[in-house]
């Protein structure tokens, strides 16, 4: 129990000093898009330890985890496969899509990353100005990484729930929600001390990271299905255990925090949970909280 809590505390401390795109600030530096290559290397060394130059990946791939299968009534007609009723057909839906990479020298526990609202796994892989993301940093430290697109998001868009994908113009809402700064008179005004790159190309790249939901009737996340995501997340953790024989460190961000706590109900293979600015935390009398305690996470 003490070992797991110590591991969680150490990871939380290490991660706190890292810049997550749109969510970090540091009054001691103003990292700009025109950083030189040497400055980028220095930053990587300061955050993730020494870098050996080339990042060597021993294995990588993609798989789906969790989900369900829907079967329609009727009989499928192979001569009329385009008919609109879907009679007798199946739909594989509500799963997570997982990209994984295993470093050549794997020395640590595997790490499973779940993004927040409006995001996909891309947010863990790079920054808007093209620097290494958290996944590369932890690969360099000997951890295999498993990067999730949650159900109804990104490459896991197949859904059991009908809904609309919003075409509203929402870029400035995301800019404000991520607490990057203020958008005034058509201009980006970053918060004082922010390390967010304030050049035109980086802001463009940030806005293009935004990823809509399928199977949603609201662009405010009001009908987000916490349990569906938690079950897919737990299935991912179980798959990692089947492949590696190791429990996983679960890293969540923002909206992903909720499913992260709940996932502990559905798997016995979470070594630690590191929640970065979670959208909420379970109350001490909740089932999620008690489960985390009982399983010594």
What are these regions (language model features)?
Residues 131-157:
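Conserved alpha/beta-hydrolase
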Residues 115-127:
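Active-site glycine-rich loops that stabilize anionic/oxyanionic intermediates
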Residues 45-106:
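N-terminal cap/lid segment of alpha/beta-hydrolase-fold proteins
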Residues 278-297:
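The feature captures the conserved acid-bearing segment of alpha/beta-hydrolase catalytic domains
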Residues 251-260:
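Gly/Ala-rich beta-loop-alpha elbow adjacent to hydrolase catalytic centers
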Residues 18-22:
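C-terminal motif of bacterial Sec signal peptides marking the signal peptidase cleavage site
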Residues 108-116:
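Short beta-strand element of the alpha/beta-hydrolase
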Residues 228-248:
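Conserved acidic catalytic loop of the alpha/beta-hydrolase fold
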């Amino acid at each position: 129990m003490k070992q797991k809590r110590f591991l969680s505390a150490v990871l939380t401390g290490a991660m706190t000093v890292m810049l997550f795109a749109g969510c970090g600030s540091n009054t001691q530096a103003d990292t700009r898009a025109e950083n030189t290559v040497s400055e980028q290397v220095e930053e990587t060394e300061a955050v993730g330890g020494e870098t050996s130059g080339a990042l060597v990946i021993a294995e990588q791939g993609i798989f789906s985890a969790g989900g369900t299968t829907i079967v329609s009534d009727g009989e499928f007609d192979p001569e009329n496969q385009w008919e609109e009723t879907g009679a007798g057909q199946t739909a594989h839906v509500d799963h997570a899509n997982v990209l994984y990479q295993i470093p050549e020298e794997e020395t640590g526990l595997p790490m499973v990353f779940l993004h927040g609202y409006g995001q996909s796994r891309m947010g863990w892989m790079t920054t808007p100005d093209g620097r290494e993301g958290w996944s590369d940093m932890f690969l360099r430290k000997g951890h295999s990484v498993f990067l999730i697109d949650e159900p109804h998001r990104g490459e896991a868009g197949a859904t059991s729930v009908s809904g609309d994908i919003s075409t509203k113009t929402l870029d400035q809402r995301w800019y404000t929600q991520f607490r990057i700064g203020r958008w005034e008179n058509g201009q980006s005004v970053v918060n004082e001390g922010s390390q967010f790159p304030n050049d035109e190309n980086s802001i463009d790249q940030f806005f293009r990271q935004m990823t809509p939901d399928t199977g949603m009737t609201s662009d405010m996340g009001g009908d987000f299905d916490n349990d569906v995501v938690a079950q897919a997340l737990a299935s991912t953790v179980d798959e990692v255990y089947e492949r590696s024989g190791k429990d996983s460190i679960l890293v969540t961000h923002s909206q992903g925090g909720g499913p992260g706590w709940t996932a502990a109900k559905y798997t016995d293979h979470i070594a630690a949970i590191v929640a970065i600015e979670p959208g909420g935390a379970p109350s001490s009398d909740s089932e999620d909280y008690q489960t985390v305690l009982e399983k010594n996470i």
